[in-house]
Every structure is written in structure tokens, then in C-alpha cells.
């Protein structure tokens, strides 16, 4: 008699790993300063630019103390000298509590709203309001939940909830909505919960330590906490931090809070903003709210036109103005919207209001260190000779071009089953992807073959 063996196929289980995107400045963790605001040569992802980083550290300290609201700083330097990196370092050093808004100069030009409205919204996003609110809560460990369901199956449910602390125990009557909330959050005996008396919101803090030895199936995310002590009913101070722009949007229309998620804010009337400013000033006097002047960073500020610069002059003098940080890589150039030239493409009257921080080109040592940091960020192993070649490419072309070759060289290395990027991999991608100067040279040689060539035998200026 033949025996039949049943085989069960086990499905393949794959680990789902979270992919974190790597950006141009994702390696920056701060400005790399010590307690005396002295910059370290290489720290927190920042390399070189010691004078600029020291100046940024002084500005940062004044922002924290709230003494520099309404001031403006201009970071000026050649392309690829770390202007945006310094601004991102300042944002990281300030932390999540200080509002930081970053925009590009060309973002304000839109058909949906005026330039001044776009700038006003950016300014209001950069000013935070810390609102203090006292709420009454009930905090305790659940001893027992009794729910009485009607025998007929219809009608409202009623029940009792027993809560305790280390010093007292109380029984509360439950209505239908509270029973639904407890059922939805799967609250059971042994859970430590808080109930907001004003809203009825239930929050689970965790399981009580006294239930740690219970024979119960628990997930790895289960958190054990101490049983609360003192009174069951407590007063708790809750601090909400919102930006002025969020308050503007919510009060600008009946369903304003929905516009916060959709982004369709439109133009907000000045009357609404004036009323909000008056209300915030009133809260401030009563001690209910605190103004947090944040930072507005405008990259490529030379793209703004003369009307925008005129608006900035007035906006910086307002009592509710954030610290304005601007970056530009232009020299003496034409102010957009006029026929006049000015340093950095910014009018003289606005330049007079700015603290100007200059950046200098990176040295060979600094360039090599930056490339090492980027390789660590992108998980790329590279030989010392390859670092030297890539550094030379970065000095002869641009730092951005050299950084972009790292990932491409890593892919070429993996295709040949290598573990470490070698000089040949760098040479391969260098020959495949042209930099700006080689691309210009190629176009000069084959300019007649291109459609709509406007060079006409003249020397092309690529400076």
C-alpha cells in the first residue's frame, strides 16, 4: 500500500526595510561649533568655512535669545561653497521648536497669488506662537470595566469604570460615547489611561508594572509604566506651538483647517491678519501665549524683483518679523525689473540693512573631507586612490559634479561585483557623464550640427 505524503509550501518571507532618501544636505546635523562658538574643522557634517560658520553661530545664539528678530543676514559666495549647507546647519541646530521656512527666490512668482502675498505667507510661517492651556485630566490604572447592555438589544449602553492610583480608588459612571471610546482603544484592566475632562479623549499610557507577570500574549511594543500616585483628578498644562500662517488659514474661511492639508490657502485678507495680530498681542499680555521669532531662508535671492525687495524693506521693520537669511551666488549684476546694476542683484537700500557673511572656495583638503562624508552618507566604500582622483575632479570641475559621481561609480562597482570603488570606476563614470566645461567644449566643436545655434562664430562666455 503506497503512502502519500502531503507537502505544504511555505511562502517566502521578505523583510521590508524602510528606505530613507538621501538628499544633497542630508549629512548635515548642525553647524559644528563648540560651546564658545568656535567652529571645529570637521563636525556635524560641516567642513571648512570657519569664519562663515562662526558668524552663523553668533546669529544662531541671538535667534535663541530672541534679540535679533527682524534682522536680515546675507550669505554670499561662489557656487558650491556651502551657502545652503550653512543655512541647513542653522535649521538643524535650532531644533524643531523654532520655525524654519526655506523657499527659493523664484517660488513667489505664481498666477494664483501676488508676490507680496507669497512673501507674507512665508514670513507668517516663520513666526511661531506657543499657546499655554490648562486642562483637567483623570489619570489612573483601570481596575475594572463593567458594561451593562440592555436585554432587548436596543437602547443605550451604560457602565462603570473603576480607576485607582497608589493612594485612592474611584468608580465613574460611563455613558454611551465613553463606552465606545474605551472599546475602540481596547482599554482593559491593568491599563494606565488618561481622560481629558473637557473633550473626553482617552489616551493609553501603557500597562501597569503590577500586570507584567500576567500570563497574557503581549506584543513587543507594549510599554510598562508605574501606577500613578496622588489624586486621580489633576490639572495639566498643555503647550501648543502653531505658526501665525496656520492661524491665518483657519480663520480665513469656514473650512479653513482643511486648507492646511490641501495647501489651497489662496490670498488671505489683511483684516483677518490684523485681528489675529491683535488677539495674539492680547494673549501675550495675559501670559497665555509666547511669540517665537523663527527663521525665513530665501535661497537664490537675486531672483526677486524690485517690488519684492521694496516689500522686504517694509516687512523687516514690522514688530512681528522673523530673522531673514538670504543666499546668493551673484556678483555685480542687474536688479530684476530694472536696468540698474547692484552688488548681488540686491538694491543698495536693502543691502544697507543686511549683515553680510561671505563664503570662500574649498581647499583640496576640505573637498576630500566632504567627499568622505558623502560616501559615508551614501554607504559607498572607496579606495584612497579613488578619493584622490575624485578630489582632483572636484577641484577642476565643481564639488557638486564630484558628489554626483559617487553614486554612479558605486553602481558601476557593483555591476563588476566589486566591494570598493576603484580609480577605474571613477574614470568610467567621468567619461560617461560630462561636466559643464566639457559639455561646453563639445557644443563649440559641433555647434553647426545643433538646431537653432545662436553662437555665430563668437567666443562663448561660460564664466
Swiss-Prot record:
Keywords: Acetylation, Activator, ATP-binding, Chromatin regulator, Cytoplasm, DNA damage, DNA recombination, DNA repair, Growth regulation, Helicase, Hydrolase, Isopeptide bond, Membrane, Nucleotide-binding, Nucleus, Phosphoprotein, Transcription, Transcription regulation, Ubl conjugation. ATP binds at residues 77-84. It comes from Homo sapiens. The modification N-acetylalanine is found at residue 2. The keyword DNA damage applies. This is RuvB-like 2. Forms homohexameric rings. Can form a dodecamer with RUVBL1 made of two stacked hexameric rings; however, even though RUVBL1 and RUVBL2 are present in equimolar ratio, the oligomeric status of each hexamer is not known. Oligomerization may regulate binding to nucleic acids and conversely, binding to nucleic acids may affect the dodecameric assembly. Interaction of the complex with DHX34 results in conformational changes of the N-terminus of the RUVBL2 subunits, resulting in loss of nucleotide binding ability and ATP hydrolysis of the complex. (Microbial infection) Interacts with Mumps L polymerase; this interaction regulates the viral transcription. The modification Phosphoserine is found at residue 437. There is a cross-link at residues 9, 444, 456 (Glycyl lysine isopeptide (Lys-Gly) (interchain with G-Cter in SUMO2)). One of its GO terms (biological process) is regulation of DNA replication. One of its GO terms (cellular component) is cytosol. The lineage of its organism: Eukaryota, Metazoa, Chordata, Craniata, Vertebrata. Belongs to the RuvB family. GO terms for molecular function: ADP binding; ATP binding; ATP hydrolysis activity; ATPase binding; beta-catenin binding; chromatin DNA binding; DNA helicase activity; identical protein binding. Possesses single-stranded DNA-stimulated ATPase and ATP-dependent DNA helicase (5' to 3') activity; hexamerization is thought to be critical for ATP hydrolysis and adjacent subunits in the ring-like structure contribute to the ATPase activity. Component of the NuA4 histone acetyltransferase complex which is involved in transcriptional activation of select genes principally by acetylation of nucleosomal histones H4 and H2A. This modification may both alter nucleosome -DNA interactions and promote interaction of the modified histones with other proteins which positively regulate transcription. It holds the Pfam family TIP49_C. The C-terminal domain is required for association with ATF2. The keyword Methyltransferase does not apply.
Amino acid at each position: 500500500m503506497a503512502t502519500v505524503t502531503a507537502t505544504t509550501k511555505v511562502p517566502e518571507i521578505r523583510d521590508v526595510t524602510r528606505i530613507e532618501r538621501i538628499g544633497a544636505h542630508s549629512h548635515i546635523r548642525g553647524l559644528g561649533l563648540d560651546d564658545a562658538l568656535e567652529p571645529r574643522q570637521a563636525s556635524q557634517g560641516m567642513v571648512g568655512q570657519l569664519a562663515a560658520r562662526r558668524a552663523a553661530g553668533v546669529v544662531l545664539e541671538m535667534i535663541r535669545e530672541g534679540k535679533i528678530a527682524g534682522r536680515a543676514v546675507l550669505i554670499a559666495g561662489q557656487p558650491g561653497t556651502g551657502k545652503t549647507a550653512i543655512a541647513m546647519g542653522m535649521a538643524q541646530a535650532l531644533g524643531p521648536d523654532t520655525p524654519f521656512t526655506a523657499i527659493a527666490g523664484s517660488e513667489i512668482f505664481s498666477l494664483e497669488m501676488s508676490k507680496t502675498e507669497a512673501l507674507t505667507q512665508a514670513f507668517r510661517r516663520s513666526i511661531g506662537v506657543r499657546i499655554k492651556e490648562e486642562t483637567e485630566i483623570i489619570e489612573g490604572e483601570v481596575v475594572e470595566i463593567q458594561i451593562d447592555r440592555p436585554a432587548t438589544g436596543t437602547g443605550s449602553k451604560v457602565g462603570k469604570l473603576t480607576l485607582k492610583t497608589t493612594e485612592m480608588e474611584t468608580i465613574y459612571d460611563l455613558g454611551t460615547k465613553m463606552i465606545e471610546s474605551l472599546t475602540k482603544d481596547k482599554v482593559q484592566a491593568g491599563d494606565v489611561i488618561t481622560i481629558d475632562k473637557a473633550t473626553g479623549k482617552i489616551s493609553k499610557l501603557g500597562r501597569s508594572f503590577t500586570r507584567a507577570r500576567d500570563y497574557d500574549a503581549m506584543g513587543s511594543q507594549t510599554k510598562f509604566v508605574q501606577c500613578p500616585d496622588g489624586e486621580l483628578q489633576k490639572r495639566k498644562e498643555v503647550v501648543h506651538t502653531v505658526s501665525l500662517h496656520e492661524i491665518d488659514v483657519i480663520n480665513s474661511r469656514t473650512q479653513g483647517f482643511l486648507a492646511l492639508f490641501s495647501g489651497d490657502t489662496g490670498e488671505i485678507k489683511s483684516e483677518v491678519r490684523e485681528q489675529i495680530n491683535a488677539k495674539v498681542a492680547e494673549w501675550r499680555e495675559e501670559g497665555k501665549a509666547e511669540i517665537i521669532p523663527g527663521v525665513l531662508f530665501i535661497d537664490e535671492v537675486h531672483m526677486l524683483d524690485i517690488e519684492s525687495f521694496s516689500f522686504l524693506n517694509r516687512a523687516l521693520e514690522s514688530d512681528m518679523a522673523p530673522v531673514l537669511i538670504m543666499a546668493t551666488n551673484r556678483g555685480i549684476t542687474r536688479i530684476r525689473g530694472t536696468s540698474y546694476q547692484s552688488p548681488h542683484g540686491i538694491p543698495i537700500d536693502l543691502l544697507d540693512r543686511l549683515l553680510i557673511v561671505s563664503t570662500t572656495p574649498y581647499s583640496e583638503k576640505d573637498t576630500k573631507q566632504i567627499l568622505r562624508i558623502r560616501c559615508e552618507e551614501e554607504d559607498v566604500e572607496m579606495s584612497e586612490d579613488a578619493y584622490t582622483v575624485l578630489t582632483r575632479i572636484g577641484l577642476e570641475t565643481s564639488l557638486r559634479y564630484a558628489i554626483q559621481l559617487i553614486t554612479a561609480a558605486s553602481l558601476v562597482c557593483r555591476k563588476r561585483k566589486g566591494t570598493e570603488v576603484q580609480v577605474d570606476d571613477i574614470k568610467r563614470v567621468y567619461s560617461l557623464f560630462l561636466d559643464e566645461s566639457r559639455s561646453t567644449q563639445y557644443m563649440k566643436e559641433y555647434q553647426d550640427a545643433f538646431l537653432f545655434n545662436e553662437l555665430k562664430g563668437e567666443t562663448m562666455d561660460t564664466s
